[in-house]
Amino acid sequence: MEFSVKNGSVEKQRTGCLVVGVYEPRRLSPAAEQLDKLSDGYLSNLLRKGDLEGRVGQTLLLHNVPNVPADRVLLVGCGKERELTERQYKQTIQKMVQVINDTGSTEAICFLTELHVKARSVYWNIRFAIEAIQENGYQYNEFKSVKPEIRRELRKIVFNIANRKDLTVSEQAVEQGKAVALGVIAAKNVANCPPNVCNPKYLSGLAKGLAKEYDNITTTVLDEKEMAALQMNAYLAVSRGSENDAYLSIIEYKGSPNPAAKPIVLVGKGLTFDTGGISIKPSDAMDEMKYDMGGAASVYGTMKAIAEMKLPLNVIGVLAGCENMPDGNAYRPGDILTTMSGLTVEVLNTDAEGRLVLCDTLTYVERFDPELVIDVATLTGACMIALGNHNSGLISPNNTLANDLLNAAEQADDKAWRLPMGEEYQEQLKSNFADLANIGGRLGGAITAGVFLSNFTKKYTWAHLDIAGTAWKSGAAKGATGRPVPLLSQFLINKAGV
């Protein structure tokens, strides 16, 4: 899809479809009012007859509107004026695309980005519209023998802006919106890939592919022999039951004009399939455990997005690829593992494997002397119980970093909620036989998992995002969401100051 912006009068637009808003109850938006005057009251006459009330999601497609040069005019309901929320705005944008795709139009000029969305700017309206449109058109058909028929559909959208002074920021919104949407799609494609294809080696191949695609990215991959030499014993214990070797992929993006600038490090849990190991999961919905690499997928997508945007930052993305399978060689409940940091961990449940992979990875990234580290993981079912599918869980001992992430989450409409930390949660991780237990009991499971990781992050500023509830959807709409690529991308945009 091609996107652009311009500043022009609605009555002069020659296009396949002109899109304007209608407020509830039956009130024309400013752009629609101009069309109404041009057409001698044609639109207002239709509203008086009750053809469109203006509720969010309602549409009315018109042909041959008097004196209007556009082939079609699409009226889109926008709800009550000045009360439009982000969610409703997304509905209006996606409904617009759905309707136009059912016509013969391949291009459209959209005036919906001129609408007032609560506490949002023109920049946000345009960027979010692009992300919503790309999300609406996403399909994963890689493994279908009969591909859906590709029909003539919308290929170009021009967003009109009311004030010429907003052109520069609007053009930036287009470029950043396209990049973030591309990152989200990349993350979805990786996460949706079946586990018999997307194993840890496949994941490392994708990481290497970024280095070939972008000049300012280099990729290093560690195999199990190299990890063993580094004493990454907890990570490797999880991998022991699988015939697919573990691989740790390090993607280095250098965009800062100061090559010595400390990097921001993103660590993604990459369990390409998680059976639970010896503590095996129930069979119901186990197929969805291919999404246990959602953290790695989102880091991969974010690295792609920032490379597209050419952000002036140094960022390192780490994909911790591994598979947790039951086998005669698999690690067991009761095992005690010596981590790369030297701390020992008693395994009480082999299905709490993500934190074992991450603890060694978090120790490994100390060598980069990072400005800060954010790990992203589908870590706990407890986070899903606590926050549902709407908010990612956030844990950090650093208020500044936590607030920066929450601010980015709000800006990107990729919500997160901060969970507490404290010594009392550390108490739940005590072991009679080792420095730590790998689980802390049923209560506060999302928090104790994050607190467990905090023991391996003492040498840098750190935050943890638990995306177990937000990385994918179940049911009829089953599939990866690409979250939290928008949150992470926005955080990095803010850090870059662009």
Curated annotation (Swiss-Prot):
It is found in: Cytoplasm. This is Probable cytosol aminopeptidase. It comes from Glaesserella parasuis serovar 5 (strain SH0165). InterPro entries: Leucine_aapep/pepB (IPR011356), Macro_dom-like (IPR043472), Peptidase_M17_C (IPR000819), Peptidase_M17_leu_NH2_pept (IPR023042), Peptidase_M17_N (IPR008283). It catalyses: Release of an N-terminal amino acid, Xaa-|-Yaa-, in which Xaa is preferably Leu, but may be other amino acids including Pro although not Arg or Lys, and Yaa may be Pro. Amino acid amides and methyl esters are also readily hydrolyzed, but rates on arylamides are exceedingly low; Release of an N-terminal amino acid, preferentially leucine, but not glutamic or aspartic acids. Its main location: cytoplasm. The active site is at K281, R355. Keywords: Aminopeptidase, Cytoplasm, Hydrolase, Manganese, Metal-binding, Protease. Belongs to the peptidase M17 family. CDD domains: Peptidase_M17. GO terms for biological process: proteolysis. Binds 2 manganese ions per subunit. Pfam families: Peptidase_M17 (PF00883), Peptidase_M17_N (PF02789). Its cofactor is Mn(2+). GO terms for cellular component: cytoplasm. Its EC number is 3.4.11.1, 3.4.11.10. It comes from the Bacteria. Mn(2+) 2 binds at K269, D274, D292, E353. It is an enzyme of class 3 (hydrolase). The gene is pepA. Presumably involved in the processing and regular turnover of intracellular proteins. Catalyzes the removal of unsubstituted N-terminal amino acids from various peptides. GO terms for molecular function: manganese ion binding; metalloaminopeptidase activity. Mn(2+) 1 binds at D274, D351, E353.
